[in-house]
Curated annotation (Swiss-Prot):
Disulfide bonds: none annotated. The keyword Transmembrane applies. A core subunit of photosystem II (PSII), probably helps stabilize the reaction center. GO terms for biological process: photosynthesis. The keyword Zinc does not apply. It is a single-pass membrane protein. It comes from Nostoc sp. (strain PCC 7120 / SAG 25.82 / UTEX 2576). It comes from the Bacteria. The lineage of its organism: Bacteria, Bacillati, Cyanobacteriota, Cyanophyceae, Nostocales. It holds the Pfam family PSII_Ycf12. PSII is composed of 1 copy each of membrane proteins PsbA, PsbB, PsbC, PsbD, PsbE, PsbF, PsbH, PsbI, PsbJ, PsbK, PsbL, PsbM, PsbT, PsbX, PsbY, PsbZ, Psb30/Ycf12, peripheral proteins PsbO, CyanoQ (PsbQ), PsbU, PsbV and a large number of cofactors. It forms dimeric complexes. This is Photosystem II reaction center protein Psb30. Keywords: Membrane, Photosynthesis, Photosystem II, Thylakoid, Transmembrane, Transmembrane helix. The chain crosses the membrane at residues 12-32. It is found in: Cellular thylakoid membrane.
Amino acid sequence: MFDALANINWEVIFQLTSVALIIIAGPAVIFVLAFRNGNL
């Protein structure tokens, strides 16, 4: 089990996760601002 975890490239996973969050968060923030008429 530890060998399997060691073989995982955590840096790549972290980068992919970061990119995914940015891609999802971008439109989400725009949608929230539009939904609230730009009022924070």
